[in-house]
Amino acid sequence: MNNKIRKSHYHADMLSVEEARDKILSKFSTLEPKNIDILESLGCVVSKDIISDINVPPWDNSAMDGYAIIKSDVEKANEKNIVYLKVIEEIPAGSMPELTLSSGQASRIMTGAPIPTGSNAVVPFEDTTELENTDKNSIGIKIKVENYENIRKKSEDIKEGNVIINKGSIITSATIGMLASIGLSKVSVIRKPIIGILSTGDELIEPGEKNQLGKIYNSNTYTLSSLVNEYGGIPLIQKHAKDQVEDLEKKLSKLKNVDLIVTSAGVSKGDYDIVKDVLDKNGDINLWSVNMRPAKPLAFGIIDIEGKKIPLLGVPGNPVSAMIAFEKFGRYAIDKMKGKEVRNRPIIKAILDSDIINHDGRRLYARVKVFVDKNSKKTIAVPITNQSSGVLTSMHEANGFGICPSDIDIIKRGEKVDVEMFTWNDEISEILNNKD
């Protein structure tokens, strides 16, 4: 039996992760559709059913380089009984046949070229006398074939008039290929949400600037922007704002055309009040405590920028807290705006390599590295040594969150833990595919 100690207390004044998420998602809806180039549509959601105007293939065509023949002509053909046929034409890919095939005849044909009338099979070059042939007007067939062998039938892929992509489908590389195959260069999708990113703090300097005493590089803007890209949004970056009302309001005003603003820092109870004052002045912003670690402090509400009402999500300034808060709340908001089904990350069971200690009664998202032991074939979770919310390397090294519930003090080494996977390799994919 797992050696877990139940808590005797609970943070009743806090919102659960699920409660906070529900409150946030209630303020979002699916965005409007937009016609975009198919090469820009990867990962987007199709806004309406797509019906093909053509057949794919548009005609019976050859699946091989070879000779179009009539099956009955070669019923007795083999290596010792070569059947010779008269070659009446050559049909390159991109050309239409000009002649009808009769018994005793063949057409030399390339892959993708239309099958001539009268033919019902194709014999590949390697099963003919192609290589040793000196008479281009004749070809020897060395095998018998089945009806329609090596022929791709008209409309076997896509049939004219059929719905080939349903509304709500997520566009993949294969989808883009299908769209191209029916001649479409553009597609109607739910547009990608534009996410404004704004970090705050006098202590920040930008990457590329000279390091200064008392300053730190602004990593949150770049981490959050990368997550927006990863989740299928479009980041709009503002240079970090100083702890001055005028500067913060100026930077926020430049984000008036976004679908969501994400700020980092300034949302904890002990933080400098400039951020809270500006948010309170310009909107209806709630400061929450969420029953999770990292990322307990969270701000969310609607801010008014020049008459436009824009949702604002304020995440903590510590880099790991910012990432986890955006994963737990921002990703879901982006999915809802994109019209995607809002889904949790996959969870697997893994055996702990060392203890996970939960010392303050919040749901703990411990950064862990999951792998499959080559000898035992067991799934192992190794907690990253330094679990501080300021240690960004813990997110770099991890591929999942080991979840310790709020009412548990410790999950011990050797016990099983639920791991929420946020990235994985082929090895972990196999576990996900085979899990109960």
Question: Language-model segments: which ranges?
Answer:
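Short, glycine/charged-enriched hinge/interface segments at domain edges or termini
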Residues: 2-17, 67-237, 385-386, 421, ...
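Short, conserved secondary-structure segments in the cores of folded domains
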Residues: 46, 58-59, 87, 97, ...
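Solvent-exposed alpha-helices and their adjacent loops that cap or buttress functional pockets
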Residues: 60-62, 77-80, 98-102, 115-117, ...
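Helix-rich terminal scaffold detector
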Residues: 1-4, 10-17, 185-315, 319-325, ...
